[in-house]
Amino acid sequence: MILTICPNPSIDCTIELESLNVGMLNRIQGKVETYSGKALNVAIGVSRLGEACTATGFMFENQQRTFEHVLTEEGIKCDFVSCEGNTRVNYKIIDKKSMLTEINDVGEEVSLNKQAQLIEKAKSLSADADIAVMSGSLPKGLNPEFYGEVIKHLSPRVKVVVDAEKVNMLAALSARELFMVKPNVKELENFSGVKIRKLTDVISASRKYFEKGVKYVLASLGTEGAVLTDGTDSFYCKSASVAVNSTVGAGDSMVAAACVGIYNGVPMREILKEAVAAGTAAVTTSGTNLFYKDKYKEIYSRLQTEKL
């Protein structure tokens, strides 16, 4: 089983415009609302690829039933810590050139009691998990150390995967050795101090993670594909050419597919190929909708990997 831990769920409102004109009237051409959160997106991706998944994290009571309905329909088992209040709303504004502008809310505060409940719940659920994924931001008022506290208490036998910004990543790395991280180019540069100009720079930058005990680095290069490295072997997979509707959720889709590959024990090349196929398939959907398996399989058949 794959466990996902989502500390900061969101309702993502994706707004389509001809172009975004700041300080002027903008007319909406399309709008899609999805019940989201990075680790919840991972859970959906895992389930769509046919593997069992349990989703936990904080969930705000006023929208909890809707979130759980959406996730249950995807075949995901839900076991959240209920909190008073409303789920934050994030706005994703996309123009006809696929330029994305994001306006993200921070969410409501979570009490110390609820924080302790999630630490215990994640610990308990991880006892039956093979892989645990924690990703995304934290609600208002939570210190980055909370990432470390959750991860520190997970079962010692579970493989831990983290996709988070630098401050939360550092807290996670201080808690235990991580099985895999998934930085994008900006996150990789910020963490390592290495400017990414060519593929070999990705390998050099990844060494900073290996020094912290990380086993695998899955580096997302956007439209250029991705690199998967363990410090000894490194592979590159270029994305397939597709019509891009929205890049939101592509990284979460990559994490989902990579975790499924890890769970099934496939070689590094296949983990990478599956991750790139899922991420590429995700950008063909509107809003924050994730990939569908038919599109994933079609793109997968077109991809090639190369050893660096």
Functional labels for PLM-detected ranges:
Residues 3, 54, 79, 133, ...:
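Structural detector of well-ordered beta-strand residues that form the stable sheet scaffold
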Residues 46, 184, 251:
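Short, conserved phosphate/pyrophosphate- and ester-handling motifs at nucleotide-, phospho-/glycolipid
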Residues 44, 91-93, 225-229:
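Short beta-strand scaffold segments in enzyme catalytic cores
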Residues 1-56, 64-66, 238:
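Glycine-rich phosphate/adenosyl-contacting loop at the front of the ribokinase-like
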Residues 24, 48-129, 297-308:
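Conserved N-terminal subdomain of the carbohydrate kinase-like
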Residues 171, 199-308:
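Conserved phosphate-binding/catalytic region of the ribokinase-like
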Residues 102-104, 129-136, 163, 182-187:
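Short beta-strands and strand-loop turn motifs
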Residues 145-232:
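Conserved phosphate/ATP/ADP-binding segment of small-molecule kinases
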